[in-house]
């Protein structure tokens, strides 16, 4: 399948593993140049090596060995102004001129709402609502000016079917959903820019394992029992 996006530039957050890595890999296989971001430099470097190999395969299959998709890795905390600045200033990257942005911040810890203080809520909202908004704000006008842009926010199916132990995530991601619904319907829609949320269900990632353990501790059921009911 040719999606017609070869040569575009994409920013993929949380790309060292899991769904973020899967998105980056799929984009590279379509000939897209990627800037990948995560906090753990070692794990991100391993992901970059795999993506570079996929990039070489893409170029080789098309007889373009000297012109393969770029893979730029930036180890930084994207939830901070400094982290976002590092991504936009990355050597070999496009600056803020991304054609595709995949926001994918790690979810806040599961637990009981009675135990969450104001700081816990602020951290959740900052990472899972405000950070994607800041990335959209930094890139969307450039997309509109060029007549093409795609923003994908990886949130959670819990936005539509809330899970009690994921209250921090439910709240923050629902706020992002409301914001995106308005912006996606604004003038940019007629300028070739789309903004969508991806609400993944259950994938066997580290995040799911953490959620299952939390549900096990709260219910008194074994991890195996919880997994069987997923």
Predicted regions and their residues:
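Conserved glycine-rich Rossmann-like NAD(P)H-binding loop of the short-chain dehydrogenase/reductase
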Residues: 32-47
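The beta1-alpha1 cofactor-binding region of Rossmann-like NAD(H)/NADP(H)-dependent oxidoreductases
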Residues: 41-42, 75-86, 118
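Catalytic loop of short-chain dehydrogenase/reductase
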Residues: 150-175, 180-189, 201-203
């Amino acid at each position: 399948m040719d999606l017609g996006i070869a040569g575009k530039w994409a920013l993929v957050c949380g790309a060292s593993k899991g769904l973020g890595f899967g998105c980056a890999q799929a984009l590279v296989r379509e000939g897209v140049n990627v800037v990948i971001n995560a906090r753990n430099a070692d794990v991100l470097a391993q992901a970059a090596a795999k993506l570079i190999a996929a990039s070489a395969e893409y170029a080789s299959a098309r007889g373009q060995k000297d012109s393969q998709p770029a893979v730029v890795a930036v180890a930084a905390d994207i939830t901070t102004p400094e982290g976002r600045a590092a991504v936009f200033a990355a050597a070999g990257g496009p600056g803020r001129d991304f054609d595709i942005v995949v926001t994918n911040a790690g979810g806040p810890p599961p637990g009981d709402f009675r135990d969450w203080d104001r700081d816990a809520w602020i951290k959740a909202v900052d990472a899972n609502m405000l950070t994607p908004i800041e990335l959209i704000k930094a890139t969307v006008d450039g997309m509109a000016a060029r007549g093409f842009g795609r923003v994908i926010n990886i949130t959670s199916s819990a936005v539509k079917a809330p899970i009690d132990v994921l209250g921090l995530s439910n709240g923050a991601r629902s706020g992002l959903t409301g914001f995106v619904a308005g912006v996606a319907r604004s003038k940019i829609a007629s300028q070739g820019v789309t903004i969508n949320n991806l609400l993944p269900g259950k994938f066997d990632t580290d995040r799911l394992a953490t959620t299952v353990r939390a549900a096990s501790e709260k219910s008194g059921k074994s991890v195996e029992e919880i997994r069987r009911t997923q």
